[in-house]
């Protein structure tokens, strides 16, 4: 499906409420955790090809950090999802007030070339924990790593829930033309301004 259809399909899926329950979020985090472990060697080979990074450096700066992020989210997710009581204004007595965490909806994650695994998958962990759908756009400047991340995501998740889009500027422009509920971007100030301008239109 093209990018517009993909975002529309994710929004439709989000609107079903399927991503909201604790059990669903927990399962998806565990699936990502297992997929990352299963594909660790593939990612190491890809990063050797793109950056000449040794496996130990890949683990210390990339995959290991994402696995730690996953462990932390799996431990704390239930607490983060709880309603939190807050003070009630006197004018509203005798009612009670609560803050209830809610998902944004459909997220776009645009990652850079220099830490392409960590800065792609760590934001994805947050998107999943938050009960969102997500489109991940790995950097075209790390082609082997981008292909490996896309493979991991496609083999792990339904595209209506989590999808990967590969490509360069044309794909970035097509993604930014869509309406997303939140965008996680890591990169230069110049490109950040382009992302902010595109997001402001929605």
Model-predicted regions and their roles:
Residues 11-15, 48, 52, 56, ...:
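A broad detector of the eukaryotic-type serine/threonine protein kinase catalytic domain
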Residues 88-156, 185, 202:
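Conserved small-residue-rich beta-alpha loop and adjacent elements
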Residues 38, 42, 65, 115, ...:
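Short alpha-helical
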Residues 106, 156-202:
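Conserved NAD(P)+-binding/catalytic subdomain of aldehyde/semialdehyde dehydrogenases
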Residues 25, 70, 131, 162, ...:
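Residue-level signal for inorganic ion chemistry
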Residues 45, 118, 143-147, 173, ...:
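Alpha-helical elements of the RecA-like P-loop NTPase motor core of helicases
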Residues 1-98:
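N-terminal Rossmann-like NAD(P)+-binding subdomain of aldehyde/semialdehyde dehydrogenases
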């Amino acid at each position: 499906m093209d990018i517009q259809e993909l975002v529309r399909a994710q929004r439709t899926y989000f609107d079903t409420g399927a991503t909201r329950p604790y059990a669903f979020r927990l399962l998806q985090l565990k699936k990502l955790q297992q997929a990352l472990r299963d594909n660790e060697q593939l990612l190491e080979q890809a990063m050797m090809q793109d950056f000449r990074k040794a496996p130990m450096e890949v683990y210390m700066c990339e995959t290991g950090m994402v696995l730690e992020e996953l462990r932390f989210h799996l431990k704390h997710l239930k607490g983060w999802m709880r309603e939190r009581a807050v003070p009630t204004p006197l004018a509203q007595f005798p009612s009670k007030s609560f803050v209830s965490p809610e998902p944004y909806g459909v997220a776009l994650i645009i990652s850079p070339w220099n830490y392409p695994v960590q800065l792609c998958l760590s934001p994805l962990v947050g998107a999943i924990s938050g009960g969102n759908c997500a489109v991940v756009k790995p950097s075209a400047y790390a082609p082997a790593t981008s292909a490996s991340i896309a493979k991991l995501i496609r083999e792990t998740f339904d595209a209506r829930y989590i999808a990967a889009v590969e490509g360069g500027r044309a794909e970035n422009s097509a993604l930014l033309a869509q309406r997303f509920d939140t965008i996680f971007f890591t990169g230069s100030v110049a490109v950040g301004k382009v992302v902010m301008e595109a997001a402001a239109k929605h």
